[in-house]
Amino acid sequence: MKSKTLPAWARLVCTAAAALVFLLVYEWAVYGVSLGKIYLPASAWSDEVYYAKQLSAVVTHGVPQGYFGFNESHAEIGRFAAWGPAVFYLYAIPGLIFRGQNAFLYCNLFWVLAGWLCFVWGTRLDWKRQLLFGVGIAALNAPVRYVFSAMQEPLHYALVLAVLGLAAGIRRGCRHAGAVWAALFALCAAATLVRPYNAVLWLFPLVLAWPRRKAVGGTVVGAAASAAGTLVLMKKFYAPYLFANIDLGAVEELLHGHFWAAARSVYYKLLGAWQQLGQEIADGTRVGSCYLLLFALLLVTLACVIWNAAHKQPVFWKVCALVVTLVV
């Protein structure tokens, strides 16, 4: 929201309040569920149970105390399920305030609102554009639906929004640029530590730093360090179940100097994923429908890039969005 009669802090408060009302109304209108009727411990999604219990353990004990896995198995104390420890320590920041059975949900609301505010601050969206933005994510459904769960996805949505907002602020020449640059680096590092493929978000500080050699070098070092850090964390503190989230076969081949074997491993992984994608779409599954929606959004964005380029209009953010999406 934007008003010339209100100070900046008051506008941010109004924006946060409006965004919160939007999220709550959407959940009630679409699913007929109010916030007070959500009880995460009774969720049918096993991931929600794992995540909620681990957040509680991190806030209370500092590390998980072992969780019930498949076939009545247990994890070692200090081991984390799915993606390693970084995500749960990030959730523990608001989790120190938001306690109780639905703490994960309240943390999701906190992160999404924080990401929304960063995005609005950097892009300077007025209330009309924010309303259009809200309609867009409501149409996608998942970005709002997952907020009211114990799933990690809302944190990733928030990190992407915050990175975009800070990058936009830097590009338009915001005040206190040094502090904003530091925050952008911290967010990109945090996103990468949460999930390795989020390293692609370093594209934004990289293109903003170009062609200054020191700035580019610092960005590359930050990206490499955070990517290596998340692999180490997952190797040391990750308790896999049924499957490993990250296949390090190609990396291990590279470390042993087997470049052709590494390339072949990546090729067959991509080929298998592409074949599975085609099967999901052909069978009309929910996953296949989501991929069709993604492809439709990519085509729309590509068409906008071509249109803007042909009419000599800015294409910077659309090109970055395309590259990031394709890499992920």
PLM segments and residue spans:
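Transmembrane alpha-helix segments characteristic
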Residues: 18-20, 132-137, 183-188, 297, ...
